[in-house]
Amino acid sequence: MERGPVAHQSISRRTLLGGTAVLGLSALASTGARAAGPMTVGVIYVGPKDDYGYNQAHAKGASALKGLPGVEVVEEENVRETNDVQKTMESMINMDGASLLLPTSFGYFDPHVLIEARKNPTVQCRHCGGLWTEANPKNAGSYFGYIAQGQYLNGIVAAHATKSKKLGFVAAKPIPQVLNNINGFLLGARSVDPSITCQVIFTGEWSLAVKEA
């Protein structure tokens, strides 16, 4: 079940959580109450769902979930990597009855996902980032795709397209996963021509369309 405009979501999830969300929390918090109806999955994005990139890829996955029987999906866009994500997670649990949360941005995990996982042991949290360790709560998992393999193929294509032998890569932040993607891209390009070079620019933000352009 997709929510309305982002502005309305911000009001309902963050501003009103301390008030109206208190009503009926005990019923929504019980595992039995969730099991009686459809499974509700909450998906949280750090930027807009139509960014033609990371967030949109997750949004397409959420759209596929909506087609599954017995599954409802609630979503919120433009949630910063601050305490805002904790408020959004809590409202999805307490207001929407979510039993599975998919916070998709790297900076959500520590401390925000870990805090909410400990506070809500019956709710499963699956974070995109590959940051899980055995010390984390049992209901807090982390996953990550083999994106570098796709970037390797992108590098091959770029190598065949370039005439200058100079490539560019616009990235967000120099975290290990991003650096792995950059390396995959350059290795793919150099499998075609070892003399190719790549200039990398970091924007410093996960979703900053103007600077990315």
Residue positions per predicted region:
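Extracytoplasmic "Venus flytrap"
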Residues: 40-61, 65-68, 74-85, 106, ...
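Short beta-strand elements at the ligand-binding edges of bilobed clamshell
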Residues: 134-159, 169-174
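C-terminal segment of N-terminal export signals and the immediately downstream linker at the start
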Residues: 30-43
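Structural motif
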Residues: 73-92, 204-213
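Extracellular/periplasmic Venus flytrap/periplasmic-binding protein
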Residues: 177-213
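N-terminal secretory signal peptides
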Residues: 1-11, 15-30
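Flexible loop/hinge segments that line or gate small-molecule binding clefts
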Residues: 118-144
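Periplasmic-binding protein-like
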Residues: 97-106, 124-128
